């Protein structure tokens, strides 16, 4: 980095409009959600379609709606901000009556408000970098674990040294959908890494981009992270004594001291869950104490369906960030170190109506669907798993072959 770039970073201010409109637009969404949350779709938990026009108008630069039935991805800035709402840990999903709602984690929100503006800015950058999976916005997951910002960085370095002019190459817009992805490009604008020029007379797109230019801030800041981006596989920022993420940039930005560190929506409450477990046309309803391990839950499911337990298994669910996690049998490898012997049912981010999978016997590939029907807070120390309702004959675990 040059001395001028270092000084530029040191002098950078953080407010509603600098280095981009990220903090203003993100705060607008938090205020809109309030204490009651907002309705989201049942499948991918995205903003309800009926809310999109209103949310779009709340943005600093709203897009002109050209589509008859716009979706969340039709508004790249909203799509990117939704990703940050989930990846930051500031929100979580609940089922309220028949509606699925996105709620604010009040504990995390208190921590958020205790941060200064530079700390809020870099907390969101951290969330994008480490947890910004496309899966959160209902797309096919891509990118690298622990560096979801790579697509944006690669695009910035390869295509924006002299800027990108789409005036005479409108077909190039389609390539932006794939790299860096329109939501990532919108986030780059919100973070102030790029400036984007629009001209609706030259483009029929909902987001009529005609020119993308890197900013001084984008050039300088991304140089601070260049080593971490290029060699992220060799960095372990969670190891005690390891160099913290963003250490070079924070050395220049003296107001950046703390980060958002969400701890979850609440402490685990002692009680009993009712799960409806289905396999084919058969189902069993199980009453399960929250304090038992996932190994014990697995055993209860297999017993309820008259399956033996001579095979490996895993539980598959979406965490509070909206990213799929696998909790594996202790004999399996798990890159995140999540094992069924170490985790209790009550430690999962369960809510009424939530669905998750018990994947058993990877050869025959049995997949049991679990639905959380209810939870009752109670002393579960003397409770044991039990079947409270059953219907249908389960499939045979082992087929008999005639020779």
What is each residue range found by the language model?
Residues 1-80, 96, 107-112:
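Short, amphipathic alpha-helical interface elements at domain boundaries
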Residues 49-53, 92, 163-168, 178, ...:
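Extended intrinsically disordered, low-complexity coil regions enriched in Ser, Thr, Gly, Ala
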Residues 81, 92-143, 195-244:
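Accessory beta->alpha helical hairpin/"wing" motif in late/C-terminal subdomains of nucleic-acid enzymes
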Residues 37-69, 141-176:
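Short acidic, hydrophobic short linear motifs in intrinsically disordered regions
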Residues 42, 78, 87-101, 310, ...:
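Short, solvent-exposed secondary-structure capping/transition elements
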Residues 23, 27-30, 146-157, 185:
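Hydrophobic residues on short alpha-helical segments
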Residues 2-18, 179-196, 201-403:
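Short linear regulatory motifs enriched in tryptophan with gly/pro/ser
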Residues 71-87, 173-195:
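Short amphipathic alpha-helical interaction segments
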């Amino acid at each position: 980095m040059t001395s001028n770039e270092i000084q530029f970073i040191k002098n950078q201010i953080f407010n509603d409009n600098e280095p981009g409109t990220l903090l203003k637009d993100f705060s607008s969404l938090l205020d809109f959600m309030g204490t009651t949350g907002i309705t989201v779709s049942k499948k991918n938990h995205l903003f309800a379609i009926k809310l999109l026009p209103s949310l779009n108008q709340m943005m600093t630069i709203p897009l002109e709606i050209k589509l008859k039935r716009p979706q969340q991805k039709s508004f790249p800035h909203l799509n990117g901000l939704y990703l940050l709402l989930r990846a930051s840990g500031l929100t979580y999903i609940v089922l309220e009556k028949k509606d699925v709602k996105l709620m604010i984690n009040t504990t995390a929100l208190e921590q958020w408000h205790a941060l200064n503006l530079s700390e809020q800015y870099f907390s969101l950058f951290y969330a994008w970098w480490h947890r910004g999976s496309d899966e959160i916005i209902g797309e096919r997951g891509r990118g690298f674990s622990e560096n979801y910002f790579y697509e944006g960085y690669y695009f910035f370095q390869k295509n924006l040294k002299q800027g990108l002019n789409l005036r005479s190459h409108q077909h190039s817009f389609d390539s932006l959908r794939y790299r860096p992805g329109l939501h990532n490009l919108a986030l780059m604008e919100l973070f102030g890494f790029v400036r984007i020029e629009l001209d609706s007379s030259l483009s029929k797109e909902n987001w009529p981009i005609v020119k993308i230019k890197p900013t001084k801030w984008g050039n300088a800041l991304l140089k601070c992270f260049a080593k971490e981006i290029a060699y992220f596989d060799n960095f372990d920022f969670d190891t005690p004594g390891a160099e913290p993420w963003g250490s070079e940039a924070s050395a220049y930005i003296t107001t950046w001291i703390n980060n958002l560190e969400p701890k979850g929506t609440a402490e685990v409450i002692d009680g009993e869950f009712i799960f409806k477990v289905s396999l084919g046309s058969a189902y069993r309803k199980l009453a399960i104490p929250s304090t038992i391990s996932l190994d014990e839950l697995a055993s209860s499911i297999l017993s309820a369906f008259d399956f033996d337990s001579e095979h490996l298994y895993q539980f598959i669910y979406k965490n509070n960030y909206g990213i799929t996690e696998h909790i594996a049998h202790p004999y399996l490898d798990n890159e995140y170190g999540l094992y069924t012997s170490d985790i209790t049912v009550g430690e999962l981010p369960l809510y009424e109506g939530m669905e998750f999978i018990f994947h058993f016997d990877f050869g025959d590939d049995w997949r049991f669907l679990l639905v959380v029907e209810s939870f009752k807070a109670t002393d579960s120390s003397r409770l044991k798993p039990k079947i409270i309702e059953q219907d249908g004959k389960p499939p045979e675990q082992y087929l008999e072959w005639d020779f």
